[in-house]
Amino acid sequence: MPIVRAKPTSPGRRFVEKVVHPHLYKGRPFAALLESKSKTGGRNNNGRITTRHIGGGHKQHYRIIDFKRTKDNIPATVERIEYDPNRTAHIALLKYADGERRYIIAAKKQAVGDTVMSGELSPIRPGNCLPLKNIPLGTVIHNIELKIGKGAQMARAAGASVQLLGRDGIYAILRLRSGETRRVHVNCRAVIGEVSNTENNLKSLGKAGASRWRGIRPSVRGVAMNPVDHPHGGGEGRNKGRHPTSPWGQKSKGLKTRHNKRTDNMIIRRRAKKK
């Protein structure tokens, strides 16, 4: 899709770069697959901030996405490709042969009128969902289950993909974009192809207000705070006086924070460290 740079008619327009998607449906979403979505402002039930930098933003409805893809051997037609404010990927509205409609994450190059299927005997085509044991080696996949029947958890964002490298007994070996190589059970399902909206990372919001529309509040540097607010706060000038840390004193550069030993044996090779 073309990337359009806005004319600098105002300071807020000067740096705007957006990806144009003429194929997206212009009307309202399918009402039966919508749910209300209430904003928390990053607060918990006590009214205390549990996640910083959240607040405001445009009202949104949640689109109910079919991440399990368990409607097997029934062909579905892509009725339309839609924008979804809850994720970076686009979504596709499917109409099954029995009349049921469901939303799925749209695959790259998926178009209106395409036929989509789920199940072990589905053809290897973008958007089709199969168990990992039925997918040819070397295939690029997305929307991957980590537990059988739980629904897709991995590679769901715009442009995301994983490559199926091989199979070892009851496990499939996958290479992630991060460089990590890991095992997943061969009965877990995955969808063929890459996730749609691959150029999402090339856009530029252009102004602070565009982040506020998305419900993202400003991030204040620790060195600009007082000592009571952050370990980097206070002092004359801009010295931290210590290694970079979070507001709660945890080291924020290079410290390992993974504590899930239960799945350590599923990771064959760790992702590469940043240089």
Swiss-Prot record:
Gene3D superfamilies according to UniProt: 2.30.30.30, Nucleic acid-binding proteins, Ribosomal protein L2, domain 3
Record region (Disordered): 222-275
SUPFAM superfamilies attached to this UniProt entry: Nucleic acid-binding proteins, Translation proteins SH3-like domain
InterPro entries xrefs: NA-bd_OB-fold, Rib_uL2_dom2, Ribosomal_uL2, Ribosomal_uL2_bac/org-type, Ribosomal_uL2_C, Ribosomal_uL2_CS, Ribosomal_uL2_dom3, Ribosomal_uL2_RNA-bd_dom
SMART domains associated with the record: Ribosomal_L2, Ribosomal_L2_C
GO biological process: cytoplasmic translation
Molecular function as annotated in GO: rRNA binding; structural constituent of ribosome; transferase activity
Keyword set, alphabetical order: Ribonucleoprotein, Ribosomal protein, RNA-binding, rRNA-binding
Pfam families noted in UniProt: Ribosomal_L2 (PF00181), Ribosomal_L2_C (PF03947)
Record field: compositional bias (Basic and acidic residues): 229-239
GO-annotated cellular components: large ribosomal subunit
Family matches, as PANTHER family: LARGE RIBOSOMAL SUBUNIT PROTEIN UL2M, RIBOSOMAL PROTEIN L2
NCBIfam families: rplB_bact (TIGR01171)
HAMAP family from the UniProt entry: Ribosomal_uL2_B
Family: Belongs to the universal ribosomal protein uL2 family.
Record note on quaternary structure: Part of the 50S ribosomal subunit. Forms a bridge to the 30S subunit in the 70S ribosome.
Summary of the function given for this chain in its UniProt record: One of the primary rRNA binding proteins. Required for association of the 30S and 50S subunits to form the 70S ribosome, for tRNA binding and peptide bond formation. It has been suggested to have peptidyltransferase activity; this is somewhat controversial. Makes several contacts with the 16S rRNA in the 70S ribosome.
Entry protein name: Large ribosomal subunit protein uL2
